[in-house]
């Protein structure tokens, strides 16, 4: 009886010693380092303690860069499944919203291709994980089923089925430009004799435009302020709006139309003095004149 009790205490103490060392190693600890830090534990006792902690899910094995296996405290959510499913689920969970590629799963788990695909299929069937096709690539990455992927994977509001939605972008640019132009016109009408007031009243905060888009239900999906800022950047480059240092924007003044006479070829023709109707050099035979008239 005393011998059994001594063995139980010895097992509990050895597990406690191993656990304390692993807990102190934030990035995990490899077997060689653990052995050197537990010189008082016989090899069989140490291995028994490790196996017990792994079985109880208190510790987990993780493959570090270079293929070295490390022990670390298991902080992953426990799921009902095989050991392979636990390992794969843990790796996907650690990737959070960024997701993880199948190559990284293979390297991190040490599973062969057949084992990995079987495990992934099982986790997908249980609705514990899902696949995401990232923008700009045909490769799939894996992410927990309950997590929304990072915008860097999906492309955000302006992508539909991994394709840039140009029509949506152009619509939003037009809405932003029209709203800003309406505010500018209102500012001029309200302050006909005060140019400074016209200028100040024509500036608006991006939040006002975002609120307008939401209230008018221009989109069927929420538009974040970050998304709107991306649209406004395009509108600035297009010359539709201008932005000042405090972030407010206003519509650019309407572009004045240029008279076609400005580009009439006669103004720079070196033989204009010899050009006469009915002559060899004449407007009727001038190729430059024909091209200019065609562009009107």
Curated annotation (Swiss-Prot):
InterPro entries xrefs: RNA_pol_Rpc34, RNA_pol_Rpc34-like, WH-like_DNA-bd_sf, WH_DNA-bd_sf
Gene Ontology CC: RNA polymerase III complex
Name of the protein described by the UniProt record: Probable DNA-directed RNA polymerase III subunit RPC6
Pfam name, any one: RNA_pol_Rpc34
Similarity section: Belongs to the eukaryotic RPC34/RPC39 RNA polymerase subunit family.
SUPFAM superfamilies named in the record: Winged helix' DNA-binding domain
Role: DNA-dependent RNA polymerase catalyzes the transcription of DNA into RNA using the four ribonucleoside triphosphates as substrates. Specific peripheric component of RNA polymerase III which synthesizes small RNAs, such as 5S rRNA and tRNAs.
Chief location of this protein within or outside the cell: nucleus
Keywords, in A-Z order: DNA-directed RNA polymerase, Nucleus, Transcription
Superkingdom of the source species: Eukaryota
A single BP term in Gene Ontology: transcription by RNA polymerase III
Cell compartment(s), UniProt: Nucleus
